C-alpha cells in the first residue's frame, strides 16, 4: 500500500486485528475500526455471500473503509481499554456458565426436594449452596432439629437465617410425598459436583468484579453518577467505546452503537427506522439502561423523573414504547459522550411542571 493521502489501513476489530493496528499506528498510519456488520453488508451488496474466504473478507473490509471513511471511528488500541474488555468478556462467560449450572441444579432439586422453592427463593445464594452441599437429599436431614439446623446456617447466612426459616425447611421436607428413589447416591454426587462448580465460579466472579472496580477507578470515569448505572454497567460501556477521543462527536458514537436512526425516503417521503448495524453489545447495554431509567419504584415514583417525563412525552406524541426507549437511548449516548469527553459528573436536570414553558 502506498503512503498517499492519509495513509489508511483497514482492519477487523477482533482476533489479530489489534496487534496489526498497534504496529500500523506505531508506523504513523491512520487505522480505521470496521465493524463486522458493515463489512458483511458490503459483502452482500457485491454478491459475495456465498464466497466466504479470507480474501473475500479483506475485500469487503477495504470497500467498506473506502465508502465510509469519514464515518468510521479511528482504531485506538489502548491497553487499558483492551484489558478492561478482556475482563468484561471473562465476566460474561462466567455468568453464562453460572446460569447453566443453576439450571442443572434445579433439575436435581426437583427430585430431591420437590418443595425446595418454598424455603430458598434463590438456590444459588451462599446459604442455599451450603445447604445443598451438606444436605444434597432429604436423607441427610434425618434426626436434625430446628435448633441444630439454625445453629449451622446462622453463621453462613450472617445471622439472616431465622428459626422460622429453619422450621419452614423441615416442615416442607416432611410434607413432601417422596418415596426413596433408587441410586440416590449417584444423583447426590451430581448435586455436590454442581454446587462445587457454582462456588468456584462465584469465587472467580468476586475476583473479576474487584479488578473491574479497580480499573474503573483507575480510568477516572464518572458514569456511575448516572442514576441506575453501577460499576458493572459502566465498565461494559467503557469496554465497548474505548477511548472517547476516537469519536469526534456524539453522532459518531451513536452510529458506532447502532442507535442513530436510519432515514429511508423515496419520492419526497421518508421515515426513520431502527438500524441493525453497529456495536450490538453497546446497543443492548444502553437500551436496557434506558428501560431501567423509565421504570417506577415499588411506591410508584419514577427512578429517574427526567427520563420518565421524556418517555411519557414521546409516548404522547404517538411513539410506541420501543420507539420512545430508542429515543432515550440516543439521549443517553449524548450524555455519556459529554461525560467521557469532559470528565464531568451527571447532574439531574429539573423537571418542568405542566404550567412552565
What are these regions (language model features)?
Residues 62-86, 173-178:
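A short, charged helix-loop
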Residues 92-219:
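Glycine-rich, often acidic, oxyanion-interacting loops/wings at catalytic, nucleic-acid
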Residues 315-357:
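Basic, amphipathic alpha-helical segments enriched in Lys/Arg and hydrophobic/aromatic residues
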Residues 10-20, 270, 274:
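Acidic, metal-coordinating catalytic cores used for nucleic-acid/nucleotide bond scission
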Residues 1-9:
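Single conserved hydrophobic/aromatic residue that forms the stacking wall/gate
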Residues 222-225, 231-317, 321, 356-357:
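Phosphate-backbone recognition surface of nucleic-acid-processing proteins
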Residues 32-73, 133, 137, 269-277:
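Short alpha-helix plus adjacent loop in nuclease-associated cores
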Amino acid at each position: 500500500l502506498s503512503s498517499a493521502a492519509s495513509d489508511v489501513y483497514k482492519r477487523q476489530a477482533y482476533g489479530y486485528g489489534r496487534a496489526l493496528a498497534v504496529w500500523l499506528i506505531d508506523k504513523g498510519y491512520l487505522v480505521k475500526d470496521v465493524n463486522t456488520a458493515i463489512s458483511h453488508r458490503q459483502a452482500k451488496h457485491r454478491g459475495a455471500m456465498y464466497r466466504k474466504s479470507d480474501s473475500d473478507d479483506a475485500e469487503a473490509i477495504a470497500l467498506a473503509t473506502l465508502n465510509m471513511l469519514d464515518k468510521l471511528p479511528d482504531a485506538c488500541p489502548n491497553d487499558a481499554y483492551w484489558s478492561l474488555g478482556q475482563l468484561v468478556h471473562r465476566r460474561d462467560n462466567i455468568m453464562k456458565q453460572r446460569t447453566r449450572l443453576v439450571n442443572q441444579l434445579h433439575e436435581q432439586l426437583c427430585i430431591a426436594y420437590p418443595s425446595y422453592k418454598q424455603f430458598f427463593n434463590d438456590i444459588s445464594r451462599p446459604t442455599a449452596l451450603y445447604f445443598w452441599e451438606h444436605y444434597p437429599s432429604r436423607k441427610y436431614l434425618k434426626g436434625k432439629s430446628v435448633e441444630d439446623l439454625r445453629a449451622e446456617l446462622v453463621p453462613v447466612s450472617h445471622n439472616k437465617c431465622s428459626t422460622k426459616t429453619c422450621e419452614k425447611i423441615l416442615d416442607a421436607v416432611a410434607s413432601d410425598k417422596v418415596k426413596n428413589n433408587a441410586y440416590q447416591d449417584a444423583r447426590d454426587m451430581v448435586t455436590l459436583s454442581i454446587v462445587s462448580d457454582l462456588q468456584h465460579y462465584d469465587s472467580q466472579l468476586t475476583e473479576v468484579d474487584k479488578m473491574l472496580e479497580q480499573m474503573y477507578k483507575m480510568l477516572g470515569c464518572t458514569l456511575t453518577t448516572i442514576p441506575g448505572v453501577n460499576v458493572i454497567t459502566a465498565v461494559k460501556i467503557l469496554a465497548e467505546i474505548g477511548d472517547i477521543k476516537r469519536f469526534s462527536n456524539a453522532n459518531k458514537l451513536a452510529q458506532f452503537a447502532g442507535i442513530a436512526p436510519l432515514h429511508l425516503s423515496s419520492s419526497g417521503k421518508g421515515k426513520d427506522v431502527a438500524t441493525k448495524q453497529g456495536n450490538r453489545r453497546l446497543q443492548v447495554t444502553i437500551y436496557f439502561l434506558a428501560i431501567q431509567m423509565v421504570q417506577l419504584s415499588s411506591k410508584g415514583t419514577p427512578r429517574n423523573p427526567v427520563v420518565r417525563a421524556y418517555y411519557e412525552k414521546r409516548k404522547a406524541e404517538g411513539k410506541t414504547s420501543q420507539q420512545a426507549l430508542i429515543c432515550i437511548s440516543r439521549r443517553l449516548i449524548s450524555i455519556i459522550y459529554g461525560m467521557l469527553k469532559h470528565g464531568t459528573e451527571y447532574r439531574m436536570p429539573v423537571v418542568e411542571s405542566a404550567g412552565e414553558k
